[in-house]
Amino acid sequence: LAAVSVDCSEYPKPACTMEYRPLCGSDNKSYDNKCNFCNAVVESNGTLTLSHFGKC
C-alpha cells in the first residue's frame, strides 16, 4: 500500500478557502480541505499525518 502524503511546505496560511475536498487525518478527524489539514499539521509540529483522501 503506497503511503499517501500532502505537501504542506506552503503552510501555515492565515485563511483557508471554503473549498470542500476532504482529507482524513491520522487523528481520525476529517478536514474540509488541504489548507485546513496542513494548518493542523503545522500546529501539531508534524505529528499529524494524512490517513487517506476523503472523509474519515
Swiss-Prot record:
List of glycosylated residues: 45
Residue intervals of the Kazal-like domain: 6-56
One Pfam family hit: Kazal_1
UniProt site positions, description: Reactive bond 3: 18-19
Entry keyword set: Disulfide bond, Glycoprotein, Protease inhibitor, Repeat, Secreted, Serine protease inhibitor
Disulfide bridges in this chain: 8-38, 16-35, 24-56
SMART domains named among the record's database cross-references: KAZAL (SM00280)
Signal peptide feature range: none
Subcellular location: Secreted
SUPFAM superfamilies, A to Z: Kazal-type serine protease inhibitors (SSF100895)
GO function terms (MF aspect): serine-type endopeptidase inhibitor activity
Predominant place of localization: secreted
Cellular component annotations (GO), alphabetically ordered: extracellular space
Comment field on protein domains: Avian ovomucoid consists of three homologous, tandem Kazal family inhibitory domains.
This protein's name: Ovomucoid
